[in-house]
């Protein structure tokens, strides 16, 4: 299966939308607000671009806030990153609360120092990246320390990116996941992932890992829109015949391709197991 002449697609990924939601409590406080924004990242599609190591804005922000949690008396006010589970988030914003100006200024300096480290790490291949930091006086409905820490720690420990490759296919991505959405509202904090795999058992293992993360940090799990993958067959007589026939007919080599995105071949191979779909 392929839309391009001279290309045979022989594997595709299955996937689903995997959500984690946790209740949070808030209380109104007056003090200093530290505004954080990660922006300018390349982003991309969580299937076709996940192997390019594009940075995830949600995870950079979680790393920043975790650093501030460990070194200052910060409380989380809000977190907003990503709009689609299957898109690598390019920008994320968050706000932290501090009781006084001295604490906020110290946190601002720490944030600026870590943002400089971020730039050193990723700017060679994320040239437009910026991390913006600012403070202001204000009143906010602040998330409790326990709830904020659970939300940020879960993000820091969550698996993300390429999880398994097929080295017989030049390192083709077999299994991955993307933290596409991380957000808080008045009563809850949510993480939404897009797991993908062309191998059903690896997908099951990935879902179990996310369920363990949810159990550890008090999240409820929801799964929607699951569709099966089409695994690559290391040995395939039908593929061998097809490659040879193409060579004889067109006097050119057929390109064999596996993709890390969904195709109709996934459901077809799943529902018609007797068909010779193991190309």
Annotate the PLM regions.
Residues 271-277:
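Conserved small/polar residues in nucleotide/adenosyl-binding loops
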Residues 108, 180, 194, 211, ...:
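Generic hydrophobic alpha-helical scaffold/packing signal
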Residues 63-80, 224, 232-268:
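Active-site-adjacent substrate-binding region
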Residues 85-93, 140-143, 231-243, 267-270:
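Short glycine/threonine-rich loop-to-helix capping motif typified by GTGT followed
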Residues 199-238:
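C-terminal structural cap/anchor segments
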Residues 108, 148-152, 176, 203-214, ...:
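A general structural signal for well-ordered alpha-helical packing
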Residues 56-60, 106, 205, 237, ...:
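Generic recognition of stable, solvent-exposed alpha-helical segments in well-folded globular domains
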Residues 1-196:
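Midchain, well-structured core segments that form catalytic/ion-binding scaffolds
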């Amino acid at each position: 299966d392929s839309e391009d002449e001279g290309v045979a697609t022989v594997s595709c990924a299955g996937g689903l939308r995997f959500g984690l939601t946790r209740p949070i409590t808030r209380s109104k406080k007056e003090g200093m607000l530290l505004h954080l924004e990660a922006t300018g990242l390349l982003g991309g599609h969580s299937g076709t671009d996940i192997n390019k190591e594009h940075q995830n804005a949600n995870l950079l922000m979680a790393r920043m806030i975790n650093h501030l949690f460990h070194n200052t008396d910060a409380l989380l006010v809000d977190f907003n990153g990503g709009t689609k589970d299957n898109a690598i988030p390019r920008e994320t914003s968050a706000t932290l609360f501090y009781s006084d100006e001295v604490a906020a200024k110290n946190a601002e300096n720490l944030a600026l120092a870590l943002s400089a480290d971020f730039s050193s790490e990723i700017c060679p291949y994320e040239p437009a990246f910026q991390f913006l930091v600012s403070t202001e006086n204000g009143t906010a409905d602040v998330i409790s320390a326990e709830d904020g820490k659970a939300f940020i720690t879960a993000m820091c420990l969550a698996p993300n990116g390429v999880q398994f490759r097929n080295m017989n296919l030049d390192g083709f991505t077999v299994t991955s996941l993307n933290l596409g959405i991380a957000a808080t509202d008045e009563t809850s904090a949510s993480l939404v992932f897009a797991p993908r795999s062309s191998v059903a058992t690896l997908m099951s293992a990935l879902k179990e890992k996310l369920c363990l993360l949810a159990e550890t940090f008090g999240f409820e799990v929801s799964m929607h829109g699951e569709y099966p993958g089409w695994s690559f067959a290391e040995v395939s007589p039908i593929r061998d015949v097809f490659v040879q026939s193409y060579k004889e007919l067109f006097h050119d080599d057929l390109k064999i391709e596996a993709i890390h995105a969904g195709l109709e071949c996934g459901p077809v191979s799943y529902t018609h197991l007797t068909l010779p779909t193991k190309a």
